[in-house]
């Protein structure tokens, strides 16, 4: 099992973690309804890439 040789300071820990945060979600406009939705996800009314995939 790996064990650190020297204690890492709070500053070094923070510098390492500075790239770990999540970015904002990418949004697209649906071609048929003009609705905003997340990329690669079905819209609220059941359309995906211009086709109806979920019947309600």
Swiss-Prot record:
Keywords: Ribonucleoprotein, Ribosomal protein. GO terms for molecular function: structural constituent of ribosome. InterPro entries: Ribosomal_bL32, Ribosomal_bL32_bact, Ribosomal_zn-bd. Residues 21-31 have a biased composition (Polar residues). GO terms for cellular component: large ribosomal subunit. Pfam families: Ribosomal_L32p (PF01783). Residues 7-16 have a biased composition (Basic residues). The keyword Ribonucleoprotein applies. GO terms for biological process: translation. Residues 1-40 are annotated as: Disordered. PANTHER family: 50S RIBOSOMAL PROTEIN L32, LARGE RIBOSOMAL SUBUNIT PROTEIN BL32. Belongs to the bacterial ribosomal protein bL32 family. This is Large ribosomal subunit protein bL32. It comes from Shewanella halifaxensis (strain HAW-EB4). The gene is rpmF.
């Amino acid at each position: 099992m790996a064990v650190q040789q020297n204690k890492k300071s709070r500053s070094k820990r923070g510098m390492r973690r500075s790239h770990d945060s999540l970015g904002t979600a990418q949004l697209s406009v649906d071609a048929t309804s003009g609705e905003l939705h997340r990329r690669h996800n079905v819209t609220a009314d059941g359309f995906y890439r211009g086709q109806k995939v979920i019947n309600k």
